[in-house]
From Swiss-Prot:
Protein name from the UniProt record: Cyanuric acid amidohydrolase
Enzyme class label: hydrolase
One of the record's GO molecular function terms: cyanuric acid amidohydrolase activity
Phenotype upon changing residue 226 to A: Reduces catalytic activity 1e9-fold
UniProt similarity note: Belongs to the cyclic amide hydrolase (CyAH) family.
Source organism, top-level taxon: Bacteria
Domain notes: The monomer structure is formed from three repeating units (RUs) that share the same structure as one another. The monomer, the active site and substrate all possess threefold rotational symmetry, to the extent that the active site possesses three potential Ser-Lys catalytic dyads. It is possible that any or all of the three active-site serines may act as nucleophile (albeit only one can do so per catalytic cycle). Mutant, bioinformatic and structural data propose one specific dyad being involved in catalysis.
Pfam families assigned: Amido_AtzD_TrzD
Record InterPro entries: AtzD/Barbiturase, AtzD/Barbiturase_RUA, AtzD/Barbiturase_RUB, AtzD/Barbiturase_RUC
Keyword entries, A-Z: Hydrolase, Magnesium, Metal-binding
Residues binding substrate: 52, 79-80, 188, 226-227, 314, 333-334
Residues that bind Mg(2+): 287, 336, 339-341, 344
Amino acid sequence: MPIAKVHRIATASPDDVSGLAAAIATGAIAPAGILAIFGKTEGNGCVNDFSRGFAVQSLQMLLRGHMGAAADEVCLVMSGGTEGGMSPHFLVFERAEGNAPEAAPALAIGRAHTPDLPFEALGRMGQVRMVAQAVRRAMAAAGITDPEDVHFVQVKCPLLTAMRVKEAEARGATTATSDTLKSMGLSRGASALGIALALGEVAEDALSDAVICADYGLWSARASCSSGIELLGHEIVVLGMSEGWSGPLAIAHGVMADAIDVTPVKAALSALGAEAGEATIVLAKAEPSRSGRIRGKRHTMLDDSDISPTRHARAFVAGALAGVVGHTEIYVSGGGEHQGPDGGGPVAVIAARTMG
């Protein structure tokens, strides 16, 4: 029976794969079992954040040395931006085989890749449907049949550049936007609605091109979408609970109502029978509230011309969550279009369950 393992590895720079290399060398991680790697890299998290691609390239070089062509199947999801005290790190998701003493259900991992997304489909229903189909494939790969057993879906999605817009126009097509920064939000939003569609959180007849990044009453409680320049398709990882997996690890999720709402994290830990600590894995989304207020108090994250609002939000939310779990290697991704309510966002906790 498969056993899910999650390894959190600190990095000294985006290309620092020495920790992963050492874990492979000592046998702590079997490269053949690596399904996905999430990373927080120290870039700006915007269009011109090449720290993500730098990390992906470095990881691919290492993995190909151990896995050959199979390395291309590993989902590499790099999220740029380690603002505030957030510490750069990798999360390595591994599938092992064995007979764990812990009874099922347990943490299950599934992954899927999509073909390259036509540039004119980005931020439109074509992207929504492409992501929804891939989420369903990833669920099947994880052995999850009930969408209620899915607790977190991570999607790495593409963005538009000036050259990509021109390429579409040369074919007689039009893109949803020519603003490259805005394209990041549209891509995240369409991907999130694709997740919501796959999980039954939003009905397909409620969706159209017009609602993407417009009707924020439509959102997923389990979506985390990160856009980047380093890919043209989507890489999708589903994390949930399955009777077909065993082992000590389990996952639970909640939705933060705002940037300082840490109650869902505590509730998730309680649901797992786990305590906060160094071993706790936290995955979260962050987005400044569009109202410009947090519990009635004014914030200035939307008014800073020097620093992107998503960068402010990542730092703020990571600090709040670090205070709960007691460490700063937290995966907080910025840009929460259709990912949780305005100013809040999905959060998931992975921890070892208390035996007995």
